[in-house]
Amino acid sequence: MDSLQLTFLLCLTQVFSFTKCQLQNITSCNSAINFTSGSIFPVNLNLTLASLVANASISGFATSSFGQDPNTAYGLTRCRAYVSKEECQTCVETAVREMQQLCPSQKEAFILLENCSLKYSNQNFFSTADSSSKIGYCNVVKASQPALFQSVLLSLILNLSSSVILSPSRLVNSSAYMDSKTIYAMVQCTPTLEVSGCSNCLQDIITYMLTGCNLNEGSRILSLSCDLRYEMYPLSLTYSPTPAPSPPPLSSQYPLPSGSNSTTNSTSPSSNGNDFLLQ
């Protein structure tokens, strides 16, 4: 059993409830790295951000860099695969505008919004995974058959996580049948990530999902470098995914821990840049 499967099974031994629903976006400005007015870096940064705005909605993902070291500005933006091109464009424009207002003199900053994320830096970070900040959206409807729901969801998510690292687009989707219902899911990584970076990012956000949304009939977990979504209805994806193989039949390969649904612990979501929202 690999570390991802083990992490899932350990997390499923605890089911958490939550009520905090405040955070809607995350912005981080690295105040330790600043530029001065009149220097060349802000010129390169403005060119980088303008390029991201111009190109992001075409494929839902864009990178850009301008300048020479040590004044090179690197930028990356990624839209959620299920948002329209118009929503993607609007989100990236909003992200740039808010970052320019909130981080007016920083050489490194990022913003995490519902429909997109954007980061810029004076260092090349394109292949580095970052899931340190996360937002979770959870459907208010709870699964009527918790044990069965957890089993089917776990099998589906494991299958997608194994498939996405082999996909050039770093985007896959699939579905799994559960009694009279079907769970539809997708996972997405930043295309520039290495296999290990994508895998580690997904492991982190799935573990996070299992602390708050694994009994809800729908969830979106968003981070800078990877996303996950599952619903009880087909997902309409604007940007083309790679279909994942159907998950294997439920068996003892991924057994639920004994008594996994017998105890409910109450905890508040963490306040270090992570939160859950009811949708």
Please place each PLM-identified region on the residue numbering.
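Extracellular secretory-pathway ectodomains and N-terminal mature segments of eukaryotic proteins
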Residues: 1-279
